[in-house]
């Protein structure tokens, strides 16, 4: 059994939600706002040369040049949006496959569909990438399945692979990406 909305609210409170959420299992506006707020990190640590070398060696390379090139090309140089949120892409077709439900949003149209698409940047011009708003809306329906339906970080690794990457739950993978660039590279390697 995956994380419930009530467990998500408890997790958000433990990770700095402000104001504290009522842990009632009802995912409303405050839960959506808190979800986005706790993942903002404008001071995320950049990867060091030693960490890059560690990643390169784990991939069988003794030079950081190739892994640096991959990082530059794959992410336009950064794993974060200007807002301080880690880069993600909402994949509505994954959410549909996992939930078997078509969901509509007044702002974003379909957030769950058998087909991919509906990729938007900032349709409501509020400075928050739409993938984050779609995710915030979807975690209020099914947190685990929503978090498995995003590609995360500098290298856009799908959340559905959280177990293979050594995370206990999908939210741990996103939290790791929030904290440092090194974690983005570890997901790739």
Feature roles, as predicted:
Residues 37-138:
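Export/targeting segments at the very N-terminus of extracytoplasmic proteins
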